[in-house]
């Protein structure tokens, strides 16, 4: 009998609000899940708290500062390349501009327009939670 243990990668995502809109970021076409939209964020490094990881990732990806508020939800999603445990947080933008260092596009969406883009599968439970809370 063999047992396969799946490594679960802990990641965080920022649901960033500014002027009543939410930031959606489009993955680069040549990346995994290329062209899909997501909440910006990334892997939690060893000995790093989720909130510290989120601040670091937003600074790296968008050259922006955020204030982190409450957790929205946690989702475990099995992609063909990895299983991730995504925790998303409601955040507010603390800077006026963003720079797309790791994404090809970004949009500020009203919650009523949140389904106007094609989201990465792991982000769908967060979308549902946002819609239920709205």
Which ranges hold each PLM region?
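Conserved Nudix-box catalytic region and its N-terminal flanking loop in Nudix hydrolases
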Residues: 21-60
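Conserved N-terminal beta-strand and adjoining loop/helix that marks the start
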Residues: 2-22, 43
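Short secondary-structure junctions
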Residues: 61-68
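Hydrophobic packing within well-folded, soluble alpha/beta domains
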Residues: 14, 50-58, 71, 89, ...
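Conserved hydrophobic "DFG−1" position in protein kinase catalytic cores
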Residues: 16-17, 24, 91, 108
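NUDIX/MutT-family hydrolases
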Residues: 90, 99-130
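Active-site-adjacent beta-strand/loop module that shapes the phosphate/pyrophosphate-binding cleft
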Residues: 65, 75-97, 107
């Amino acid at each position: 009998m063999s047992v396969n243990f799946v490594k679960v990668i802990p990641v965080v995502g920022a649901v960033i609000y500014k002027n009543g809109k939410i930031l959606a970021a489009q993955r680069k076409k040549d990346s995994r899940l290329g062209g899909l939209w997501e909440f910006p964020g990334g892997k939690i490094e060893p000995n790093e708290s989720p909130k510290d990881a989120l601040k670091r990732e937003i600074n790296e990806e968008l050259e922006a500062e955020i204030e982190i508020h409450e957790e929205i939800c946690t989702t475990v999603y099995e992609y063909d390349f990895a299983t991730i445990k995504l925790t998303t947080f409601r955040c507010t933008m603390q800077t006026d501009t963003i720079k797309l260092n790791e994404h090809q596009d970004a949009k500020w969406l009203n919650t009523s327009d949140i389904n106007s883009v094609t989201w990465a599968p792991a982000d769908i439970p967060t979308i549902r939670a946002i819609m239920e809370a709205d």
